[in-house]
Amino acid sequence: MTTRLLLLADTHVPKRARDLPAAVWSEVERADVVLHAGDWVDERLLDALGSRSRRLVAVWGNNDHGALRERLPEVARVQIEGVRFAVVHETGAAAGRERRCAERFSDVDVLVFGHSHIPWDTTAPSGLRLLNPGSPTDRRRQPHCTYLTVVAHEGRLGDVTLHRLAR
């Protein structure tokens, strides 16, 4: 079986946008699993995404407080199609990230993270794949708002695609 995943982080709704872009909601409808790496800001988006997703795996971020921290873990771990994922918001500075994350998440194949709003796709020497989808609502110093789609099949990742949203 093939499983289609949507990777999101740093949505900051309603602070950075009133809602997720229509293209992201379309991806939610197509995805088998949505992974969200935190910074929701408002619990209403968690409820909306939870009700519209087939399956949601999510964590809280540094801008999430109160009910969001009560409802979500700091780190989530899930196995999908034989691929072991961890989801976390904060991984620290870019310098040394692969080494730090490979040590902290030695039991997973893929780490999905957020916080920087900067898309990231690297593989640590240990084999750990690190993916940051950027932000679909707040591009910061990036030219575009972004998100990732990924396909998991028979223990492997494929079709890792960074989607750039029009301003």
Label for each model-derived stretch:
Residues 52-53, 126:
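Short, structured coil segments at secondary-structure junctions
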Residues 7-9, 33-39, 57-62, 87-89, ...:
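Active-site neighborhood of phospho(di)ester-bond hydrolases with catalytic His/Asp-centered motifs
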Residues 12-16, 40-45, 63-69, 92-98, ...:
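Active-site environment of divalent metal-dependent phosphoester hydrolases
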Residues 1-51, 64-73, 82, 143-145:
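N-terminal active-site segment of His-dependent metallophosphoesterases
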Residues 11, 15-25, 87-105:
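Pre-active-site segment of Zn-dependent metallo-hydrolases
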Residues 2, 8, 80-81, 103-107, ...:
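Binuclear metal-dependent phosphoesterase catalytic core
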Residues 75-76, 119, 148:
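Residue-level detector of beta-strand structural context in well-folded domains
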Residues 55-96:
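Helix-adjacent hinge/juxtasegments
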